[in-house]
């Protein structure tokens, strides 16, 4: 005979199963929006690569019969005189003549393969735009503008969602590191806590006092307690009118609690998974705003992140050293994209697409913390100046 399970195990199994069923919708609700955004971005990049490869990759039959190109080549032959001896004057004329070279004359169909077009699409919706690859046809230019019009907001949506994940990871990692080393909370001076989180008790005095008086009852307003400085009659009339207007507004408006309950908990109709997805969509971008990490820590993360890519990139881009690779990665992640460094093998760099997205978000977090710190410094300076002006005798 088989051994029967103890009653405690029977009771624990349904409880554990219930907890697992409850956690699965929440986990899916957190991961599903980000995965959907990322899948949409990948699909958008693939569709754009196919379109640009078809539009810009077509051979131009009129390129060989272009009169401007023929005249350019004839003048070039006249300058060179079809020999290898070039005098100083002819060299100067040659440099001036080459400045009239148009990029569409050098266009080749193999330059717009599917992978090259995919690399171009990544530079468009990421707003990097290196500059060495761009459309030259009229249809390609209009298609590029339309593609960027929808691709850039989609890219920012993906960055915002990934930013919440990175903010959560960085915040928890720093908290555990701080607890492991038993560090005090104010060990770093450059923290962004006063600006990232608004204190609930930081309301102005002129807003807090009328709110307290209005919340009082009518009897308390009509029969106030005796005090040393009795309020003026005009102040009492104004406060009484505010109280009456507020009571009328509360009577005219229907109770909103049932409506808020039905709107905030659509799981009664849509299910727990749908409710979790909707609630997570409403909270997109909130984790970055609540992030509280010292600036030296995030600066160290940025330096380590760029250094890793700068050490790996020269393995296939042999012409780049560590310094040039570090400069290229920084220009890419900050979306500056000068275009002064051109990758010989951009197809391999496509594997760094996730690296670029994550790196752009890390730099955005660093810039956000720096912005908060500068704003805090500016506010402190303004408060100091205002206090000096108040203390000065007039």
Curated annotation (Swiss-Prot):
Changing residue 264 to A: Loss of interaction with YWHAH. No effect on channel conductance. K(+) 3 binds at residues 129-130. Residues 335-340 are annotated as: Selectivity filter 2. The chain crosses the membrane at residues 32-52, 142-162, 293-313, 347-367. It is found in: Cell membrane. Keywords: Cell membrane, Disulfide bond, Glycoprotein, Ion channel, Ion transport, Membrane, Metal-binding, Phosphoprotein, Potassium, Potassium channel, Potassium transport, Transmembrane, Transmembrane helix, Transport. Detected in brain cortex, cerebellum, dorsal root ganglion, spinal cord and testis. High expression in trigeminal ganglion (at protein level), also expressed in autonomic nervous system ganglia such as the stellate ganglion and paravertebral sympathetic ganglia. Expressed in all adult spinal cord and brain regions, with slightly higher expression in thalamus, hypothalamus, hippocampus and posterior corte (at protein level). In non-neuronal tissues, substantial expression found in lung and heart and weal expression in liver, testis, kidney, small intestine and spleen. Residues 127-132 are annotated as: Selectivity filter 1. It is a multi-pass membrane protein. It catalyses: K(+)(in) = K(+)(out). K(+) 2 binds at residues 128-129. Residues 261-266 are annotated as: Interaction with YWHAH. Disruption phenotype: Splenomegaly due to increased lymphocyte proliferation. The modification Phosphoserine is found at residues 264, 276. Residues 210-215 are annotated as: Interaction with calcineurin. One of its GO terms (molecular function) is metal ion binding. Induction: Up-regulated in Tregs upon TCR stimulation. Each subunit contributes two pore-forming domains 1 and 2 which assemble to form a single pore with M2 and M4 transmembrane helices lining the central cavity and M1 and M3 facing the lipid bilayer. The transmembrane helices are bridged by the selectivity filters 1 and 2 carrying a signature sequence TxTTxGYGD that coordinate the permeant ions. Up to four ions can simultaneously occupy the selectivity filter and at least two elementary charges must translocate across the filter to convert it into the open conformation. It is linked to Frameshift variants combined with alternative initiation of translation result in the production of aberrant truncated KCNK18/TRESK proteins with dominant negative effects on KCNK2/TREK-1 and KCNK10/TREK-2 channel subunits, causing trigeminal neuron hyperexcitability and migraine-like phenotype, similarly to TREK-1 and TREK-2 double knockout mice. Regulated by extracellular protons whereas human ortholog is not. His-132 is responsible for proton-dependent specific activity. Homodimer. Heterodimer with KCNK2. Heterodimer with KCNK10. Interacts with calcineurin. Interacts with YWHAH, in a phosphorylation-dependent manner. K(+) channel that conducts outward and inward rectifying currents at depolarized and hyperpolarized membrane potentials, respectively. The outward rectifying currents are voltage-dependent, coupled to K(+) electrochemical gradient across the membrane, whereas the inward currents can be induced in response to activation of Ca(2+)-mobilizing receptors. Homo- and heterodimerizes to form functional channels with distinct regulatory and gating properties. PANTHER family: POTASSIUM CHANNEL SUBFAMILY K MEMBER 18, POTASSIUM CHANNEL, SUBFAMILY K. Belongs to the two pore domain potassium channel (TC 1.A.1.8) family. This is Potassium channel subfamily K member 18. It comes from Mus musculus. The lineage of its organism: Eukaryota, Metazoa, Chordata, Craniata, Vertebrata. The gene is Kcnk18.
């Amino acid at each position: 005979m088989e051994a029967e399970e103890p009653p405690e195990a029977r009771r624990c199994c349904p409880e554990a199963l219930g907890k697992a069923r409850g956690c699965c919708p929440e986990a899916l609700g957190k991961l599903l929006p980000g995965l959907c955004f990322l899948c949409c971005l990948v699909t958008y990049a693939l569709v754009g690569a196919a379109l640009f490869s078809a539009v810009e990759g077509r051979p131009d039959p009129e390129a060989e019969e272009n009169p401007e190109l023929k005249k350019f080549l004839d003048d070039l032959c006249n300058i060179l005189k079809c020999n290898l001896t070039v005098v100083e004057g002819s060299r100067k004329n040659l440099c001036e003549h080459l400045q009239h070279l148009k990029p569409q004359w050098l266009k080749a169909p193999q330059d717009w393969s599917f992978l090259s077009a995919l690399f171009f699409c990544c530079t468009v919706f990421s707003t990097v735009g290196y500059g060495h690859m761009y459309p030259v046809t009229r249809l390609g230019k209009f298609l590029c503008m339309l593609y960027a019009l929808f691709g850039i907001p989609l890219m920012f949506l993906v960055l915002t969602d990934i930013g919440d994940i990175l903010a959560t990871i960085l915040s928890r990692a720093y908290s555990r590191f701080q607890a492991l080393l038993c560090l005090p909370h104010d060990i770093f001076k450059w923290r962004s806590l006063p600006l990232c989180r608004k204190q609930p008790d930081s309301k102005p005095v002129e807003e807090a006092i009328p709110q307290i008086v209005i919340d009082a009852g009518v009897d308390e307003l009509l029969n106030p307690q005796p005090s040393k400085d009795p309020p003026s009659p005009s102040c009492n009339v104004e406060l009484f009118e505010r109280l009456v207007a507020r009571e009328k507004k509360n009577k005219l408006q229907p109770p909103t609690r049932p409506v808020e309950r039905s709107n905030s908990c659509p799981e009664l109709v849509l299910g727990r998974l749908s409710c979790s997805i909707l609630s997570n969509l409403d909270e997109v971008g909130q984790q970055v705003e609540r992030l509280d990490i010292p600036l030296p820590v995030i600066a160290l993360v940025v330096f380590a992140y760029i250094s890793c890519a700068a050490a790996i990139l020269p393995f296939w881009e042999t012409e780049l050293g560590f310094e040039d690779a570090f400069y290229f990665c920084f220009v890419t992640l900050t979306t500056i994209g000068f275009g002064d460094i051109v990758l010989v093998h951009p197809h391999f760099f496509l594997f760094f697409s996730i690296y670029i997205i994550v790196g752009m978000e890390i730099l955005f977090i660093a810039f956000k913390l720096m912005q908060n710190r500068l704003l805090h410094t500016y506010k402190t300076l303004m408060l100091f100046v205002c206090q000096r002006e108040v203390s000065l005798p007039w």
